């Protein structure tokens, strides 16, 4: 839908950082189509899909996982919880809860001949955004500042932002969604693995979670395959080794978030005098935050 070659980071009306890179630092997709593509590919690979109403209970029976739903019990060797920030699997199998949940409102604004670049607008809640697609913009506002004292944003805040930026109140398909960002210390227990937002693996700087969701899902699956292929290999240990590296990365993002949202004026000048270009170039070249900061790839091994 769109490759973000040009990006704007706005700290105020007068303080804006404009960055660009030919490769583009991120690619915009239609989420429904993105999810549908991977779902269809998964089914093609042999996965069986079953729609259920509600999971009532998840239990460990010896070395198996028992899942009770719709009056039935399903037994499996491993359970992967990929059910988002409000994960039922997480709630039924662990004491891991989000202390300061972050969330966002997002809607669609028609382009109508305009051509806004990808833009992040930082504010007292976290940031608002404009993400261009082919025929519309994804426009949203999120409370990325994870604090019990921070004010909850509302749909009214989104309407105010759209009105100020586009001079119109016309915004369609408004949705509200949570973002799982508190998995800095998450470790898999037994043979139940959480991935993506269910494990709190979205980064806390900008709230991006798709990359880590795909990556953690990939490693959870491959760790199970490796354990089936080698009796001496523990899927849990392999997945937790991956999580150790990934959560170190998340902790680095959290440090960055504290600087960005706690000291916006300093952040502006840091980005203006070199750090912004360093990040733009690094992300456009597919580097992690650790690699951008000069460290080796956390997934090199």
Where are these regions (language model features)?
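A short coil-to-beta-strand element that immediately follows conserved catalytic motifs
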Residues: 49-51, 100-104, 166-177, 237
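Conserved FAD-binding catalytic core of PHBH/FMO-like flavoproteins
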Residues: 85-152
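Structural motif
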Residues: 64, 73, 127, 136-138, ...
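FAD/FMN-dependent oxidoreductases across multiple families
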Residues: 57, 147-224, 228-229
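C-terminal helical "tail/cap" subdomain of flavin- and related membrane-associated enzymes
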Residues: 222-301
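Conserved N-terminal helical subregion
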Residues: 2-92, 98-102
């Amino acid at each position: 839908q769109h490759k973000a070659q040009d990006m704007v980071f706005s700290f105020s009306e007068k303080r804006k950082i404009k960055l660009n890179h030919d490769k583009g630092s991120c690619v915009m997709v239609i989420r429904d189509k993105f999810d549908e593509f991977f779902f269809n590919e998964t089914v093609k690979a042999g996965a069986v899909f079953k729609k259920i109403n509600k999971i009532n209970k998840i239990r460990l029976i010896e070395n198996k996982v028992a899942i009770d739903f719709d009056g039935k019990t399903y037994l499996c060797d491993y359970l992967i919880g990929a059910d988002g920030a409000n994960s039922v699997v997480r709630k039924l199998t662990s004491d891991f809860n989000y202390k300061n949940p972050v969330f966002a409102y997002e809607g669609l604004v028609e382009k109508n001949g305009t051509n806004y670049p990808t833009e992040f607008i930082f504010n007292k809640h976290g940031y608002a955004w404009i993400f261009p697609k082919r025929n519309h913009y994804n426009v949203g506002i999120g409370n990325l500042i994870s604090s019990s004292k921070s004010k909850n944003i509302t749909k009214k805040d989104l309407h105010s932002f759209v009105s100020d930026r586009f001079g119109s109140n016309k915004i369609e398909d408004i949705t509200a969604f949570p973002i799982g960002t508190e998995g800095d210390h998450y470790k898999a227990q037994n043979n139940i693995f959480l991935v993506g937002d269910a494990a709190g693996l979205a980064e806390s700087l900008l709230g991006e979670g798709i990359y880590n969701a795909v990556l953690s899902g990939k490693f959870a699956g491959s760790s199970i395959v490796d354990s089936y292929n080698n009796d001496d290999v523990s899927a849990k240990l392999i997945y937790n080794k991956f999580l150790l590296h990934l959560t170190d990365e998340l902790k680095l993002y959290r440090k960055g978030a504290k600087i960005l949202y706690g000291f916006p004026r300093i952040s502006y000048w840091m980005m203006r005098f070199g750090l912004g270009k360093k990040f733009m170039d690094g992300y456009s070249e597919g580097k992690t935050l650790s690699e951008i900061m000069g460290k080796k790839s956390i997934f090199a091994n």
